[in-house]
Amino acid sequence: MEDVLDVYHRPHDPLRPVVCLDETSRQVLANTRDPLPVAPGRPARHDPEYERKGVVNCFLVTEPLRGWRQVRLSDQRTRLDWAACVKELIDSHYPDAERIVLIMDQLNTHSPASLYEAFPPAEAKRLDDKLEIHHTPKHGSWLNVAEIELSALQRQCLNRRLGDRTQPGRHHVRLALYHQRCPHQAQTPLSSNSRVTEH
């Protein structure tokens, strides 16, 4: 536990950013009938029947000291999906960083072995060399800021029917709502600081 707390005490360094990663899965449910909209004195009403549209895995990556977050959606929760998320983090979001200090829980897919399963050895080594991994202790995942962000996201926008993943705007609206309710954590507009990507 002290290891993770020591990492959080480090000052902000763009060359060695402290990034937290966590994931959760959500069932995608669509309405079978259009809900009745909000009216004066009456909340929105939804039919209790729904249609199952599968499950989506949400990777949430955040850099707390910068106020940046991203949600990445995938169809599965495998080593390959985690490796793809980490590759995107390194190559797209932190290409100039010397090393990324990555805090995450001890899920079996959260290891350099996943990189070697997903990519050729040279590429896996390149990605692994860019990471400084710190795992939260067992039963201590509450130390991971990404888990706290996922909890807030769950309470504010994932606790209702998500609809159909083929409607990309819906996810952006829900994340925008979450972003709007957390203005103290993000100083720049949603379009440049937070986003949803689907893979």
Q: Locations of the language-model features?
A:
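Extended, low-complexity cationic-aromatic segments
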Residues: 1-87, 186, 190
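Short beta-strand segments
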Residues: 19-21, 101-104, 134-135, 174-177
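Conserved RecA-like P-loop NTPase ATPase core
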Residues: 22, 61, 105, 144, ...
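C-terminal domain-tail junction helix/linker
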Residues: 32, 164-199
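RNase H-like polynucleotidyl transferase catalytic core
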Residues: 44-50, 123-145, 161
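Active-site proximal helix-loop segment of RNase H-like, two-metal nucleases, encompassing DDE(D)
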Residues: 69, 138, 146-161, 165-167
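Acidic/histidine-rich, metal-coordinating catalytic segments
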Residues: 97-110
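Short, aromatic/basic amphipathic alpha-helical patches
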Residues: 113-124
